Amino acid sequence: MKNLFEQSRSHWVRYDHYELKTAKDGKRYITPGKDTKPEVYNPLKEVPGIVLDALNVGMLMMSRSPAVEVERAVLKFVTRYGLLGLMTALPTTPAFMDYEAVYLPKNHFLKEESMDTDRYLALFYPFDQLDLVKRGIESAWKVSEDRTMVALTMTFMDEPMAKTMSFQRQYAEPYDWVAQQFKDWAFTLTTSILYYQDYRLIDQDTRELYQKAMAAFGGIAPSYHIELLDKPTIYWDFHSLLLGIQMMFSFMLVDEEHPLRLCKNCQKAFLGSHVNTTFCSPQCKNQYNVHKLSLIHISEPTRPEPI
């Protein structure tokens, strides 16, 4: 699995600062801060950290951690890796600007099967609209005179227009949607682990529920091509970070050499050295055993001292 990602590359954009802003309708969004600087990076070089970080944000939600703690973790993730690219992840194609409308498969966030393009774009530009004109399948976008934004647009000029648009400073993603995606990934990991851990303890109906839950995990497969660099390299055409993380997570989920596990003590996701690994660190193992011993002592009746 490690070699697969070592010989692969892709590109995404992250800014050096993100903030939470509230729109007129009261909905909260994550967006790059004012005058922040973008950076192009290869998310595949961040494996397995990027996947583990995403899962552990979701595990905070699964364990019903305080909202402030979850919010802090979400912003920390986004600052480190960038926004998820929901605008290009949700439609049937990231090239939706080439069509008269935006077509949407079933998802957690939007019930409509299709939306007017302007209405769809408004979901991701609640504060400052792009200078964009859309007529039928034709669209014209005037990039701001900000040199950084112009350079960023030129870097991704061969990519779908919507992907390049999502790298602009005006772009924002609903906080609740981003947080829900992390929770969905954590739920998938938990389902996979519990299915095998409790297999002999659950009935057939429960097993089928687990199987159906896992079958719902998936997405549109990314395209790729081979580049002849210092050695043949797979270039994955991720049009959203969400899709990239989903693919990396999928490979890690089926990796038997270093299986994804949940720590028995702190409930954090980690890569185990073998299937039966239950603790993410020696410290967690010691803490768990100390806590277990203290519970045993508490439950034991106090014996009277001999006279």
Residue ranges, per PLM feature:
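Short metal-binding segments enriched for Cys and/or His
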Residues: 289-295
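Short helix-coil boundary/hinge micro-motifs
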Residues: 1-270
